[in-house]
C-alpha cells in the first residue's frame, strides 16, 4: 500500500530534495502540494515548487498558501537558500499554474474527498496548517497525523533556542501543537545529524538528471558546505514516513513560546515530564545516520 500524503512546503533547496523523495519513494503517494512563505516569499516558493513539478513531469496539484504569518511580520532564510530560494540551476520555462483557491482550502477539500485519513507533511512554517485547523475544524478526523520538520529540544538555528520554521510563525505553531491531532516532530536534534557527505555529493552529477540538478543547487546552499557535508533538514520528515526505524522518538509535552523577548519561537520540549502535562507530540531525538544516508542514496537513484 502507498501511504497518501499532502506536502506543505517552502522551497528552498533542501525542500527540493524532500519533494524528490516524496514523489519517487515507492512507499508514498503524494496527492497534493501547498506552498507557504518561509525560506523566501510565497510567490517565490510557489514558482520554485511548480518548477520542480515540471522538472519531474509530476502531475500533482499545487495550491499557493499564506503570504505572511498569522500575526507578525514575515522573516525569511534567503541567507541560506539565496534570494530566489533555488539559485544555481536553470529550469526550463513552463505554463503550470497553482490552483485557484488558498492552500488551506485546497487541503480541506482534498481531505474531505479522500477515502481514508491522510498524513499531512509540513516542512515550512505552519501557517497553512494553523489556518486549516482553526478555520476548518471539521477536517480533524480526516487527518491521520501531521509530520513536521521544525522545532528543537535544545539549541536553535535562527535564535539561540528557536528553529526557523517555528520562529517564522510561532502563533501558528502554537495553534497546531494545541490542536490535539497526532504530531511527529522532526527537529534540529535529528536534522543536524542528517548530513550528506562530500563523497556522496561528488557522485550526484553522474547519478541522473535529478542528481545533476541537485548538485547545482547545493553549490548555493549554506547549511554546511560541499567540502564538509550538507544538512538535509526537510528530508527527515519524509524519511520518517518511509523508514521510521531510523529515528528514536519520545512522546513529550511540547509548547511553543510566543511572548519571550529572547525565546519567541522556542519549542519547549518537556523530555523529563517536569510539567506533568500529557504528551502531545512524538519528538525525534536521535537518527541512524548511516541508515539515513543509505536511504537517501536509494531514493535519489529512483528520481529520474
Swiss-Prot record:
Position of the signal peptide: none
GO biological process, one term: pyrimidine nucleobase metabolic process
Protein name per UniProt: Non-specific ribonucleoside hydrolase RihC
Pfam families xrefs: IU_nuc_hydro
Keywords: Glycosidase, Hydrolase
GO molecular function: purine nucleosidase activity; uridine nucleosidase activity
HAMAP family: Nucleosid_hydro_RihC
Recorded GO CC terms: cytosol
Source species of the chain: Shigella boydii serotype 4 (strain Sb227)
Function: Hydrolyzes both purine and pyrimidine ribonucleosides with a broad-substrate specificity.
EC numbers: 3.2.-.-
Active site: 233
Gene (UniProt): rihC
Alphabetical list of InterPro entries matching this protein: I/U_nuclsd_hydro_CS (IPR015910), Inosine/uridine_hydrolase_dom (IPR001910), IUNH (IPR023186), Nucleosid_hydro_RihC_nonspecif (IPR022976), Ribo_hydro-like (IPR036452)
Amino acid at each position: 500500500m502507498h501511504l497518501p500524503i499532502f506536502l506543505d512546503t517552502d522551497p528552498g533547496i533542501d525542500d527540493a530534495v524532500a519533494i524528490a523523495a516524496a514523489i519517487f519513494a515507492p512507499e508514498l503517494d503524494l496527492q497534493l502540494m501547498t506552498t507557504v512563505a518561509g525560506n523566501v516569499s510565497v510567490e517565490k516558493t510557489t514558482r520554485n515548487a511548480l518548477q520542480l513539478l515540471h522538472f519531474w513531469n509530476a502531475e500533482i496539484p499545487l495550491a499557493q498558501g499564506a503570504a505572511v504569518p498569522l500575526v507578525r511580520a514575515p522573516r525569511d532564510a534567503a541567507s541560506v537558500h539565496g534570494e530566489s530560494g533555488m539559485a544555481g540551476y536553470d529550469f526550463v520555462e513552463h505554463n503550470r499554474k497553482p490552483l485557484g483557491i488558498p492552500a488551506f482550502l485546497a487541503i480541506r477539500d482534498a481531505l474531505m474527498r479522500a477515502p481514508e485519513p491522510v498524513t499531512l507533511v509540513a516542512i515550512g512554517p505552519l501557517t497553512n496548517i494553523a489556518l486549516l485547523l482553526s478555520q476548518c475544524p471539521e477536517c480533524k478526523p480526516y487527518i491521520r497525523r501531521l509530520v513536521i520538520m521544525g522545532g528543537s529540544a535544545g539549541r536553535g538555528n535562527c535564535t539561540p533556542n528557536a528553529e526557523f520554521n517555528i520562529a517564522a510563525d510561532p502563533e501558528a505553531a502554537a495553534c497546531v501543537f494545541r490542536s490535539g491531532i497526532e504530531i511527529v516532530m522532526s527537529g534540529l536534534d535529528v536534522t543536524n545529524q542528517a548530513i550528506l557527505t562530500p563523497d556522496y555529493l561528488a557522485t550526484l552529477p553522474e547519478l541522473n538528471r535529478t542528481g545533476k540538478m541537485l548538485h547545482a543547487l547545493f553549490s548555493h546552499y549554506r547549511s554546511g558546505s560541499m567540502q564538509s557535508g550538507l544538512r538535509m533538514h526537510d528530508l527527515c520528515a519524509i524519511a520518517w514516513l518511509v523508514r521510521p526505524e531510523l529515528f528514536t522518538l519520545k512522546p513529550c509535552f511540547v509548547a511553543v513560546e510566543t511572548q519571550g523577548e529572547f525565546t519567541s519561537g522556542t519549542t519547549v520540549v518537556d523530555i523529563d515530564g517536569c510539567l506533568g502535562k500529557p504528551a502531545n507530540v512524538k519528538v525525534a531525538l536521535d537518527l541512524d545516520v548511516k541508515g539515513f544516508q543509505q536511504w537517501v542514496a536509494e531514493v535519489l537513484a529512483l528520481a529520474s
